[in-house]
Structures are given as structure tokens and as C-alpha cells.
């Protein structure tokens, strides 16, 4: 299985994927090595560079939205969410699902904005599918690899989390079961209804009642 490496000077990073049969040449100069480097000898490293530049552009765009004083907080959050979803959809279609066995597809799954992964394998059902696709492909091409097993574990854990959230949502939408509602230590109140008949609160358990207090 391929291994991943980083060349780093300060906050300038070059990501590489190396196969044991490859000889890779990297040329770069500080302080713009993250985007200005050239790499030869590895098609995958060239693809990873392409992905890294796309991620840098995405991050710059998101920061621009956050710093725009003309956009309110809610609108900014909504715009950022839409931009990220568009980015993920593009990466899935053009990289991950196209060649899930590639090191670049593995790399794409773990791209981040700040401390947050772009692909969310804990809560997003669609993102979990992407992790599962790469995991299955790596099982075929790199059987027994630690990275492939890690992807499987992430996908399985994500599916468990999604099921738990779906069950909780279903329970909340069903409402409260009246048979599970119990009363204790309540203050007994007796009031006349609109027909002049006295009604006690304890007589109305399980019923919807409108109380109209007026002077």
C-alpha cells in the first residue's frame, strides 16, 4: 500500500504519496512552496497537488465569506455549508468514486478546513458511502493494509452513529406516549367549565384542556 509523507517549512506543506517502486522529484521554493512546487515521477502526487490546491482555494473562499461584513451570521453559515457540499460533490464524482483505489482518493477523504474534516464520517450518510467505497477498493488492491482497515472502522462507526441519530429523530417525531406520563405531587385545582360544572385537574389527565383565566 502507498505511504503518505509531508515536506514542510513553517506553514508551507507539500503532501506526497509514495509507492516503493517510484522515484519522485520535487522542486519548490519558500515561501510559496505549497502551491508553487512541481512534482515528477508520480501521477498520484500530481493528483494530490491538484486536490491540495482545490482545498486551499476552498478555505480562502470560506474565509472570505466569514469576513464579509455585508453577510449576516446565519446567511454566512448557510453559504459556507452550500459551498462545502458543492466541493464534496465535485470531489466524489471526479476523484473518489472514479478511482477509489488510488492514494489520492484516500487523501481526499481526510482533507480539512481548520480542525474540521470536510468529509464528515460521523454524521453524514453520503460521506460515509465515500469512506466505504475507498475501504472496499483498498481491500481488493491492498488486502490487510492498516489504512484500509482504518477506513472500514470509520465507515462502520459512522453507520452506527447515523442509525442512532435516525432512531432518536423517529422517536421525537412520534411524540409523547400518554401511557408513559405520570403525575405526582400536583396541586389540585377545581374550576367551573363554560357550562358551570366543576372540573378538577386530576379528572382531566390525558386530555387536552384550554384554561381561560379572566377577570
Predicted regions span which residues?
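A non-transmembrane, solvent-exposed segment enriched in polar/low-complexity residues
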Residues: 1-95
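Glycine-centered tight beta-turn/hairpin loop motif at sheet-sheet or coil-to-beta transitions
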Residues: 11, 194-196
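Amphipathic alpha-helical repeat scaffolds of TPR domains
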Residues: 59-60, 100-118, 149, 153, ...
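Short coil/turn connectors between adjacent alpha-helices in alpha-solenoid helical repeat scaffolds
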Residues: 75-79, 117-127
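Amphipathic alpha-helices of TPR/Sel1-like and other helical repeat/solenoid scaffolds
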Residues: 83-98, 129-139
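Structural signature of alpha-solenoid helical repeat scaffolds
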Residues: 100, 122-126, 143
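N-proximal helix/coil linker or "cap" segments that precede and/or mark the start of modular domains
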Residues: 128-192, 202-205
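Short active-site neighborhood of thiol/selenol oxidoreductases, capturing the structured segment around
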Residues: 197-215
Amino acid at each position: 500500500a502507498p505511504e503518505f509523507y509531508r515536506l514542510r517549512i513553517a506553514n508551507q506543506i507539500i503532501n506526497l504519496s509514495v509507492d516503493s517502486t517510484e522515484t519522485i522529484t520535487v522542486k519548490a521554493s519558500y515561501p510559496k512552496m505549497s502551491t508553487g512546487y512541481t512534482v515528477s515521477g508520480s501521477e498520484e502526487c500530481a493528483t494530490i497537488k491538484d486536490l491540495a490546491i482545490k482545498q486551499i482555494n476552498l478555505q480562502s473562499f470560506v474565509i472570505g465569506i466569514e469576513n464579509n461584513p455585508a453577510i449576516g451570521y446565519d446567511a454566512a453559515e448557510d453559504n459556507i455549508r452550500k459551498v462545502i457540499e458543492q466541493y464534496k460533490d465535485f470531489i466524489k464524482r471526479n476523484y473518489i468514486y472514479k478511482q477509489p483505489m488510488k492514494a489520492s482518493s484516500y487523501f481526499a477523504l481526510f482533507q480539512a478546513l481548520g480542525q474540521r474534516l470536510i468529509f464528515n464520517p460521523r454524521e453524514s450518510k453520503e460521506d460515509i458511502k465515500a469512506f466505504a467505497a475507498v475501504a472496499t477498493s483498498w481491500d481488493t488492491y491492498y488486502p490487510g493494509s492498516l489504512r484500509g482497515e482504518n477506513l472500514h472502522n470509520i465507515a462502520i462507526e459512522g453507520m452506527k452513529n447515523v442509525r442512532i441519530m435516525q432512531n432518536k429523530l423517529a422517536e421525537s417525531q412520534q411524540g409523547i406516549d400518554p401511557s408513559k406520563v405520570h403525575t405526582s405531587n400536583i396541586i389540585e385545582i377545581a374550576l367551573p367549565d363554560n357550562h358551570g360544572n366543576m372540573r378538577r385537574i386530576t379528572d382531566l389527565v390525558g386530555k387536552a384542556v384550554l384554561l381561560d383565566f379572566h377577570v
